[in-house]
């Protein structure tokens, strides 16, 4: 990925702090939906991401397409984010989270306590259960997990999850895998403005411009899987998503000009040539 001259103020971008870890990249990626492991590995590398999420249940059960998945990634280079995808209740999510922590340890990340919390009883729209998510989050925080909960763009729920000790909040941009982009910008903006933990826009981002849009709003990071894995050229799309995420963050930090209802000339009026 293209680097920025260290003399530029943009190079002072602060690191992303989640739990006890710091990260340079603000793009998180996934491991699902790739045609093969080699494409997945190359895409992860091209994206420049440092956090990669893995569905614990699918790895544990050797679901089709997931056999050998955990071993296919070089976990010395990226941080594993186990997730509870497929869990329909809080109790199930807590059990799977514990398995995820053990899986991370077995793969060499002894101090990895991260868990992406997903409680999704709805198999059609894949919308997260707010009550089950809150219940599971409270228990997992008590057990020492750094909880990254996947939620609807609900500012009140986001604040409550922050209050119980979650390490981030992860509001969806639009339904998982839909590629619809950011459909609830107003609520996500409220979440960003009121959060004291990182806000990660997760799900629905379909293009680099949408990744940049999320970052320009002030999101701390984005998580993108389907848009990369199912692109015609996943490796190239991963590169584009990494660049867009970085560009969006720089744009947010640099401060865009205000929107005006009238024109403002770029050139001074003084010294005009008149007839």
UniProtKB/Swiss-Prot annotation:
CDD domains: ThiG (cd04728). Disulfide bonds: none annotated. Pathway: Cofactor biosynthesis; thiamine diphosphate biosynthesis. Signal peptide: none annotated. 1-deoxy-D-xylulose 5-phosphate binds at residues 177, 203-204, 225-226. The keyword Transferase applies. Its main location: cytoplasm. The active site is at 116 (schiff-base intermediate with dxp). Its EC number is 2.8.1.10. InterPro entries: Aldolase_TIM, Thiazole_synthase_ThiG, ThiG. Pfam families: ThiG. GO terms for molecular function: thiazole synthase activity. It is found in: Cytoplasm. One of its GO terms (biological process) is thiamine diphosphate biosynthetic process. It catalyses: [ThiS sulfur-carrier protein]-C-terminal-Gly-aminoethanethioate + 2-iminoacetate + 1-deoxy-D-xylulose 5-phosphate = [ThiS sulfur-carrier protein]-C-terminal Gly-Gly + 2-[(2R,5Z)-2-carboxy-4-methylthiazol-5(2H)-ylidene]ethyl phosphate + 2 H2O + H(+). The keyword Ribonucleoprotein does not apply. GO terms for cellular component: cytoplasm. Keywords: Cytoplasm, Schiff base, Thiamine biosynthesis, Transferase. Belongs to the ThiG family. PANTHER family: THIAZOLE SYNTHASE. Catalyzes the rearrangement of 1-deoxy-D-xylulose 5-phosphate (DXP) to produce the thiazole phosphate moiety of thiamine. Sulfur is provided by the thiocarboxylate moiety of the carrier protein ThiS. In vitro, sulfur can be provided by H(2)S. Homotetramer. Forms heterodimers with either ThiH or ThiS. This is Thiazole synthase. It comes from Acaryochloris marina (strain MBIC 11017). The gene is thiG.
């Amino acid at each position: 990925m293209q680097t920025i001259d260290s003399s530029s103020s943009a190079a002072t971008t602060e690191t992303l702090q989640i739990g006890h870890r710091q990260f340079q990249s603000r793009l998180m990626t996934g491991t699902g939906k790739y045609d093969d492991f080699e494409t997945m590995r190359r895409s992860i590398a091209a994206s420049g991401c440092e956090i990669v999420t893995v569905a614990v249940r699918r790895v544990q059960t050797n679901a089709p397409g997931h056999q050998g998945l955990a071993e296919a990634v070089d976990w010395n280079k990226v941080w594993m984010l186990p997730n509870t995808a497929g869990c329909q209740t809080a109790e199930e999510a807590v059990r799977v989270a514990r398995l995820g922590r053990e899986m991370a340890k077995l793969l060499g990340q002894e101090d990895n306590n991260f868990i992406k919390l997903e409680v999704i009883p709805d198999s059609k729209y894949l919308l997260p259960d707010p009550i089950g998510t809150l219940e599971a989050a409270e228990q997992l925080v008590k057990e020492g997990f750094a909880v990254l909960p996947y939620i609807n763009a609900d500012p009140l729920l986001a604040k409550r999850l922050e209050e119980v000790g979650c390490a981030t909040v992860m509001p969806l941009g639009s339904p998982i895998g839909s590629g619809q982009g950011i459909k609830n910008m107003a609520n996500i903006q409220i979440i960003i403005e009121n959060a004291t933990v990182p806000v990660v826009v997760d799900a629905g981002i379909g293009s680099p411009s949408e990744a940049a849009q999320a970052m320009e709003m002030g999101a701390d990071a984005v998580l993108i899987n389907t848009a990369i894995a199912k692109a015609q050229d996943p490796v190239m799309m991963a590169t584009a998503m990494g660049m867009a995420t970085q560009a969006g963050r720089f744009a947010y930090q640099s401060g865009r000009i205000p929107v005006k209802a009238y024109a403002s000339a770029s050139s001074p009026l003084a010294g005009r040539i008149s007839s």
